[in-house]
Amino acid sequence: NPKRTTPITDYLVVSPAEGRILATDVSPVPKDLDLPLGEWRRISIFMNVFDVHVNRSPVAGKVVATAYHKGAFLNASIDKASEQNERQNMVVEMASGQKIGVVQIAGLVARRILLEAAVGDHLNVGQQYGIIRFGSRVDVWLPATTPVNVLVGQTAIAGESILADLSGKMEEITDGVCR
C-alpha cells in the first residue's frame, strides 16, 4: 500500500484503483447501483495481478449506500463483468449533494472483495476504503456530461491520477499519447 500524493479539491475525481483504463463511455447505470436510472459516465479501471489492489475514494463525501452482489468470476477486463461478476457497490454523496457510484468487481482469480467503508462513514479523497485480491476491476459512475481526463489504455495511479472534473471547467481529453 504505497503512499500517494492526492490532489485535494472539491470537484476533481481521482482514480480509485491502479491499473489500465478500459472504458470512459456513457451507458445506462446498473439497476442495482443506488443512483437515478439513466445514462451515466462510466470509467472502468482494470487491475492485473501485478497492480496495487488497494482501492481509494475517488472523491470526498459520505457513504450513503453499499450493496454486495454475488455473481460469476468472468475475466474482469470484459464488459459484461460489470453486471455479471461478484461485486460490491458503494455510493458516495459529496458536500455539493452530487452522488457518484464506485463498484469493486471481482475477476477471474479474485474472489475476495473487501469494503472497509460503511454507510454513514465520511471518506476523504484518496482515502483507502477497500481492496480486491488479484486481477479485478473498479467502475466509477459519474454524471453523463462529466468531462474525462484519461484515455482508454492509459495507466491510472490510485489516489493520484485525475479521472474527471465535476466542475465542468476542464476540457475533455479525446486523443493523445498514453504511457
Task: Indicate residue ranges for each PLM-predicted region.
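Contiguous, well-folded functional domains in the mature portion of proteins
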Residues: 1-179
